[in-house]
Regions:
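Basic, helix-initiating cap at the start of DNA-binding domains
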Residues: 1-23, 32, 54
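An amphipathic alpha-helix adjacent to DNA-recognition modules
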Residues: 9-14, 49-76
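Generic alpha-helical secondary-structure signal
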Residues: 11, 36, 58, 87-90
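Short alpha-helical functional segments enriched in proximate histidine and acidic residues
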Residues: 19, 66, 98
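Helix-turn-helix
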Residues: 19, 26-54, 58
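Residue-level signal for short amphipathic helical patches enriched in basic/charged
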Residues: 40, 62, 102
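Hydrophobic alpha-helical connector segments
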Residues: 72-107
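Short, intrinsically disordered, charge-balanced linker/junction segments flanking boundaries
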Residues: 109-112
Length: 112
C-alpha cells in the first residue's frame, strides 16, 4: 500500500500504463485504474492528475524523459556530423532500449 502522495501517484501511473497497454487507452476507465491501484477513493486519479488527459500526458512524459536521456548519451558519441544512417540507428536503439523492461514494452504498446 502506498505510504504517501508520491507513492500513490506512481502506483496510479504504473497501473494505468499496464492497463492502457493491455486494453487500450480508451477502453480503460478511471475507476478501473483506481481500483487496480488499490485506491478506495474513486477521485484519487483526479486529485493527483486533475484530468484524464493530464494522467496520459504524465504517463508519456515519464517514459520520454528516460528516452531523452538515452538519446542524448548516444548522440554525444556520434560526433558533429552524424550520417542519416547513424541517426536512424540511434532512434532504433533508443526505442529498442524499451524492450528490456516490462514497463518499457507497455510504453511501446501504448504509443504504437
Amino acid at each position: 500500500m502506498p505510504r504517501n502522495s508520491s507513492d500513490t501517484k506512481a502506483l496510479l501511473l504504473d497501473h494505468a500504463e499496464k492497463m492502457f497497454a493491455e486494453d487500450g487507452v480508451f477502453a480503460v476507465t478511471n475507476r478501473q485504474i483506481t481500483e487496480a491501484a488499490g485506491q478506495k477513493n474513486e477521485s484519487a486519479l483526479n486529485y493527483h492528475f486533475g484530468t484524464r488527459n493530464e494522467l496520459i500526458i504524465t504517463l508519456l512524459t515519464r517514459r520520454s524523459k528516460d528516452l531523452d536521456t538515452i538519446r542524448a548519451e548516444l548522440l554525444a558519441h556520434l560526433g558533429d556530423k552524424p550520417t542519416t544512417r547513424e541517426l536512424v540507428q540511434l532512434l532504433v536503439e533508443v526505442y529498442t532500449s524499451c524492450l528490456h523492461t516490462e514497463s518499457g514494452c507497455d510504453y511501446l504498446r501504448i504509443v504504437d
